[in-house]
């Protein structure tokens, strides 16, 4: 069994050694331009077209939860990967836990009004504020995939009213499910906190725009953990300036790194992190990949395969 590996920033030698330990029968090599030797599996992130084109691979593993970069490259270069080759993404591998930590910490930050107290502190103003009540602090999750379900589970511990919206209806205990565009307005109408965990598809690009934000309750909060292209940043800034949206926590942006001149940096109601909400944990990723390859070799059914038509 031959495995080729390509990632522009990961420690390639660490991955090769870890994969050797996890799959002793495999020959693992770092792919370099000009390498046209045969391979059974490819582990990639932002791969060059020539790495995958023309290969009779058993499967390709994207080394992250998102596959929009490889799918967009496939649209431009359909010869890059045969339609018969399954594409897998890292469904969790520790990312769910990281998303839980991020979401819970920020929801509690807003619920306890720490954002308001920070603004008061900046002006040396001492003033206790009325508390928020859980029953009025409904949390809505846009996107009901693996990571969305993990975030919902973690927030249930805090007894917030929860709802989710997705393409198809879900049956999550304790979570009110909304499905399809026809139910989006009803979903948004009660969301005091909107958490975005949607996949990046042509249908979801720019979905968080003026029209969507206007359907939220006054003084709502936005937490974007998915992709920057989901948010029309000018519309969000306008909603923040008007008070329609009281605060935003943003981990992803249309341009990354976020340009220094972006008004988001200095906005008093915006908190920024540099795309770190959930990163690939190498040891857990190697464990997932090795188990999945073992299942594929046995002809077993596996999880995590990307539906190229849907984009996730």
Curated annotation (Swiss-Prot):
Catalytic site positions: 227, 275
Catalytic reaction equation(s): glycolate + NADP(+) = glyoxylate + NADPH + H(+); (R)-glycerate + NAD(+) = 3-hydroxypyruvate + NADH + H(+); (R)-glycerate + NADP(+) = 3-hydroxypyruvate + NADPH + H(+)
Pfam families associated with the record: 2-Hacid_dh_C
Presence of keyword Transmembrane: no
PROSITE patterns linked: D_2_HYDROXYACID_DH_3
UniProtKB keywords: Cytoplasm, NAD, NADP, Oxidoreductase
Annotated compartments: Cytoplasm
GO CC list: cytosol
Enzyme Commission number(s) from the entry: 1.1.1.79, 1.1.1.81
Principal subcellular localisation of the protein: cytoplasm
GO molecular function: glyoxylate reductase (NADPH) activity; hydroxypyruvate reductase (NADH) activity; hydroxypyruvate reductase (NADPH) activity; NAD binding
Keyword presence, NAD: yes
Sequence intervals crossing the membrane: none
HAMAP family, A to Z: 2_Hacid_dh_C_GhrA (MF_01666)
Record-stated family: Belongs to the D-isomer specific 2-hydroxyacid dehydrogenase family. GhrA subfamily.
Described function: Catalyzes the NADPH-dependent reduction of glyoxylate and hydroxypyruvate into glycolate and glycerate, respectively.
Official protein name in the record: Glyoxylate/hydroxypyruvate reductase A
UniProt organism field: Escherichia coli O127:H6 (strain E2348/69 / EPEC)
């Amino acid at each position: 069994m031959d495995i080729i590996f390509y990632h522009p920033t990961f420690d390639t030698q660490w991955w090769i050694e870890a994969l050797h330990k996890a799959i002793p029968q495999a020959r693992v090599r770092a792919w370099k331009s000009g390498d046209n030797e045969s391979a059974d599996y490819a582990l990639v992130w932002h791969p060059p077209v020539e790495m995958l084109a023309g290969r009779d691979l058993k499967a390709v593993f994207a080394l992250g939860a998102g596959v929009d970069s490889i799918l967009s490259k496939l649209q431009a270069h359909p010869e890059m990967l045969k339609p018969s080759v399954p594409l897998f993404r890292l469904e969790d591998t520790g990312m769910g836990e990281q998303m839980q930590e991020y979401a819970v910490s920020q929801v509690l930050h807003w619920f306890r009004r720490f954002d308001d107290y920070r603004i008061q502190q900046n002006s040396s103003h001492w003033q206790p504020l009325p508390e928020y009540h859980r029953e009025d602090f409904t949390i809505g999750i846009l996107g009901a995939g693996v990571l969305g379900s993990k975030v919902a589970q973690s927030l249930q511990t805090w007894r917030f009213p929860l709802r989710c919206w997705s393409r198809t209806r879900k049956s999550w205990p304790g979570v009110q499910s909304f499905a399809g565009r026809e139910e989006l307005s009803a979903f948004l109408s009660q969301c005091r906190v909107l958490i975005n965990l949607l996949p990046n598809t042509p249908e979801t690009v720019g979905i968080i725009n003026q029209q969507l934000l206007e359907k939220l309750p006054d003084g709502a909060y936005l937490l974007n953990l998915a992709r920057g292209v989901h948010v029309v940043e000018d519309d969000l800034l306008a909603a923040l300036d008007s008070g329609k949206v009281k605060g935003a926590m943003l981990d992803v942006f249309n341009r990354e790194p976020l340009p220094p001149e972006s008004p988001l940096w200095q906005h008093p109601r915006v908190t920024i992190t540099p795309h770190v909400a959930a990163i690939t944990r190498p040891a857990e990723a190697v464990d997932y990949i090795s188990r999945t390859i073992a299942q594929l070799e046995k002809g077993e059914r596996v999880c995590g395969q990307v539906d190229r038509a849907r984009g996730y």
